[in-house]
Amino acid sequence: MNPDNEDSIHDFLQSQITDTPLSLNNELSNRGVKFNHRDDFEEIRTFIDEFIDGNNVNRYIVLPGLRGVGKTTILFQVYDYLLNQKNIRHEQILYFSCEELNKIEDCDIYDTIKYYLKTFHNSSLQTLDEKLFLLIDESHFDKDWSLSGKIITDKSKNIFAIITGSSAINLEYNAEAARRMIRYPITPLNYSQHLKLKYNYHTDISNDLIDLLFNG
């Protein structure tokens, strides 16, 4: 990290720590109606619960997917779950978008997290003694995202990281990092999933069609 940028990265991180909890309602609802969870969220929540319970194996989750399929919403739902259901302090959860981080010259994911630990937790990757959750959006703006994620989660067993990015990140990850990460592609909703999310209507379309074809 360029030392001249420390004030900028400090202000950026302080804003993320302070403002993200206040933005949850706007990010997770429309006209007062809270968004339902995708099935993908339920899978990710399992890894989170295991980590909180002391299992530190599956801590590096990567969510590739097309723009607009709901990756950012999942990250905010994870934040909300940690804060309001698991009683994790907001100081232990960091959300940021690499698209915004990219506006700070010579600043990447790895340097940002090192600065975050040093400045806001008086710690380092090697000495961190509390559980932290990193929710990193739009990782494709950092060409070294996969290696950074690997190093961060390798050096600290107390960090749980979820990283999202465009579908292209499927082709960009470091070979060594690929052995450590869990890739969970976020795909466009099918019709059943759309009904569940938008109208809270649960149905198995395939079974309904079979029943209609054979039973009229």
Q: What do the PLM-derived regions correspond to, one by one?
A:
Residues 135, 160-166:
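Structural recognition of the conserved hydrophobic beta-strand(s) that form the central parallel beta-sheet
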Residues 1-58:
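A short, basic N-terminal segment
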Residues 57-76:
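Walker A/P-loop nucleotide-binding motif
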Residues 146-162:
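Conserved catalytic/switch belt of AAA+ P-loop NTPases
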Residues 94-129:
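Short glycine-rich substrate-engagement loop in P-loop NTPases that contacts/grips substrate
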Residues 166, 171-216:
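Interdomain motor-coupling "hinge/lid" segment immediately C-terminal to the ATP-binding subdomain
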Residues 124-145:
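Conserved P-loop NTPase "ATPase switch" module shared by AAA+ and STAND
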Residues 72-90:
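P-loop NTPase Walker A phosphate-binding motif
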